[in-house]
């Protein structure tokens, strides 16, 4: 069961102001798949999504993390229905199908990618809409927190909404989105993305956050400590592809 279904975020998710996200992971092999997939994103998929009034769409390359080469797509929408019907609408779009031919109709002996995995997320009440960075020079950090139980997961989401997001912003961290996993393979879990100028900027800002008195007090409260509510954290470093809209 998705954590959001049990929490305040679940009750709020019917609000049209709160976004939903598809986070797509494209696992690739080095070689022709890289250029083919990038071309598919740039010339077929992202233009088709924009024609559906979906965007901005983020397109990223995994720089630090397991399973390289890997690309990620972040697709925002104002409703679950929009994301659920995405493949059906794309399949019926003749202009998209023509532009996507090389990717969609690649032979089985030369597939365009190894595998595509999709996670469906609902935006946190405390950060209901994606915020795209305005700087040209940027990297991204994609973090996923898994919890041992639904109750622990709900408490971690509440912790973000009640105080942790505000501490992030006050100490200079720049969130792009926060999402509660509704459908995915690592549940219960949440995922969020931050943006920085470079790795040095990332390390500097995390150090400020870690030393913040309000964060130290919040994270030490009974019920808020990592051993109680977080069972695993994954941490990926991404860079935007040249045509990324985020």
Give names to the regions the model predicted.
Residues 1-97, 102-215, 225-246:
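Short S/T/G/P-rich N-terminal loop/turn motif that feeds into the first structured element of a domain
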């Amino acid at each position: 069961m998705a954590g959001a279904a049990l929490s305040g975020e679940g009750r709020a998710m019917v609000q049209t102001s709160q976004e939903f996200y598809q986070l797509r992971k494209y696992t690739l092999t080095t070689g022709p798949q890289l250029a083919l997939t990038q071309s598919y994103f740039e010339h077929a998929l992202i233009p088709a999504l924009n024609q559906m009034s979906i965007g901005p769409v983020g397109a990223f390359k995994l720089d630090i993390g397991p399973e390289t080469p890997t690309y990620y797509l972040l697709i925002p929408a104002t409703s679950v229905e929009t994301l659920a019907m995405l493949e059906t609408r794309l399949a019926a779009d003749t202009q998209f199908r023509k532009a996507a031919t090389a990717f969609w109709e690649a032979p089985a002996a030369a597939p365009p990618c190894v595998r595509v995995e999709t996670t469906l997320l609902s935006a946190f009440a405390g950060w209901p809409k994606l915020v795209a960075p305005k700087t040209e020079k940027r990297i991204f950090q994609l973090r996923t927190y898994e919890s041992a139980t639904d109750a622990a997961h709900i408490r971690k989401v509440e912790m973000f909404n009640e105080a942790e997001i505000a501490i992030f912003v006050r100490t200079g961290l720049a969130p792009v989105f926060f999402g509660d996993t509704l459908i995915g393979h690592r549940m219960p879990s949440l995922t969020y993305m931050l943006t920085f100028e470079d790795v040095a900027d990332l390390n500097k800002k995390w150090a400020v956050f870690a030393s913040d008195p309000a964060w130290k007090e919040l994270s030490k409260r009974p019920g808020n400590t990592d051993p109680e509510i977080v069972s695993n954290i994954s941490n990926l470093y991404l860079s935007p592809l040249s045509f990324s809209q985020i």
